[in-house]
């Protein structure tokens, strides 16, 4: 018993050290029995009475704890039992038994015979009864053995002296439970042991919220199988896919499947659904978060699933709830009518306000009016007689052709712009109207006289006339030869003498008038036969008179010339030197003076047979003379290759070859070859040269001279900063000379840009790209479509954008942009501004600033090219003269535009005293309220404005920012301050 007392004394010391840690259990463990937490005696039953003994000890908080000890090691045949009360299993099919104990090393007990043991047994018994049979009647067969427990560490007398206790922990599981509860029994066969703690628990998967689904506490299964658990959505959430998870045997959640989502009007926040606050909405459960109401809509209450449109704004039925509310467009602008007899072409510009939508369409309404003035004028719908091409309603482009109108009739056409919400607005539609009067044809042609090689015609103009007659067009051809060749002549007179005809040949003549409203129709035909040559002597007395006068006049002129040379050769030489060189080329032929010939561009569309235009202006090349070497690019119609051309009796040259891709239509073939028929009319060192075409075999080819350095924009970017100003001027001079030649031939390029200028090895620049189709759909610089393709907004003059009015003056505007591209080494005009912002900025007076290191005189020439009034822009001939003068006088290029601010202290900014005056000076007055609201009310405060602050103020256009910041630099120079902007 002495040993027992020693043990009972030492065991509490060990408990005090560890008890606090023993009471913290994981969340997934549910305790059914914990001996350390019992408030009083455990009341377990022991048998025999001298076996297991309940001992009460104090933990570090002076809370009593109950333990059981036994140490009957001196006597053999020990069989001491200890049994717990009924432990309710609470539905668990598997429970765990955790035993914490200390055990004395038998070898450390002096004088103990071989009866000492170092193990004990643990049993359990299932029962539905809370009262068990007395332990003295226990039969071991009634209990199921869990295990024999041995200590991993046992303590000795030395450990007792050193106050070192060794605590063992063993955990065993019991599965397959089915009854109400179970009893645990501990069997001692002669060990010295203390049960410090006995805990019975089961494992569960604790309550969890995952993917907005709540999964309840779930008891693990009776074996290692997973238990499938179905979750329920949290409040204000709904199932997207049935949420499920699996509870594992060790009490952990595995394999989440499915999820819940917050209902419309709610968003997920920290695992629950929170209502959208005012001003926000969530339209669909599939959306993750509440978002701010789209422009022109609002939500005044929480939980909004959609936002309501502001007054005057609407949302179409097909519009998503995330789309901004929109409104009907404003009226179209700038209507233009072009009358061609009984047909009218109507064009207009898109509405200034599209209503915020991209589905703008147009409808055209036609009324036929009586022509009376004032209130007595009566108009009625045109009815089905007028034909609209492509259609009358639902037009997607701002253009329509109206045909089959009645001649000499007043019409009113009203154009309205519509979009997807026009039908939702109660406001009346906004229209723009234009009045036109259909014109009448030229009256019948009259023959005045005819000769062997000429015919004189006369006619009367249209009456009444729609506008002023600009000119008349006379077309004639040999009878039965119309399909092969015909000639077009123009005159401002009501009569014309047609020369160069074949004697004794029958011709067909037709005449039509062109007024401000366009061309009229041809009025009838007149068939005339020229006289035979042998009829002149005895025939027309007029011819004899003309011949006699011609002979006499020639004789007199000859006498005068001889006298001039004899009397004063020097004086006549002086007179000749002052004479127009063109006058020397005059010749007398058949009694008439033949005037010098002026070349004029002939549009391929004037040919009824486009193939004839190709034959007239382009040389056919045998394909055997061409050798293709490599592909250098791809064009609109097919590949572009480099190769060699070898013509008979000529040296081999390098050429560029455009080929027409397979599967082309006849229309594509005509468009492809039309470029050749245009290029073939030009002969200038700064215009790309046509070598010829291949049309008699496939693929069809256009062969041009080869330009080694490719397009000018790419070439400049590749060689940024590597040329002198004089070299750049030489390039610009070549481009201007080529454009002067084109303008003198009455050819308008329409797409002059650095990308359409080619550069050869000698840095000679040549104008290219003369295609008729102007299909630029893949060009990122293009904007809205016209009859000739898309317009490259950044290079195009304002009148050409607004009214489709392309002239040599609009080419001059484009040339100014090319100048800017060249000096900036291929920088993109207007930088990253959108096309619409460019149109708006230019219309408000903004012009591109001088590129870096740009001479002042060059930037001024650019500004001259960008005059809003096209008549104020220089002609190409003037531009060439200006560039020649600058090249001859390099000193004029020294002053740089971007350094002029610092060199000249007297700037326009020096004369202003207020922010408002300053903004008006630089034509940025629309931003007065922006500056005032931001607190910039004095010029001193403006000195420190940066680009980021301009963004905050709402000055978003990049061009406007550059203009304001540039002027701020002038202000800083005047005030002696320099701030990084």
UniProtKB/Swiss-Prot annotation:
It catalyses: L-tyrosyl-[protein] + ATP = O-phospho-L-tyrosyl-[protein] + ADP + H(+). Pfam families: EphA2_TM, Ephrin_lbd, fn3, PK_Tyr_Ser-Thr, SAM_1. The chain crosses the membrane at residues 546-566. Its EC number is 2.7.10.1. A motif (PDZ-binding) lies at residues 979-981. The keyword Magnesium does not apply. Belongs to the protein kinase superfamily. Tyr protein kinase family. Ephrin receptor subfamily. This is Ephrin type-A receptor 3. It comes from Danio rerio.
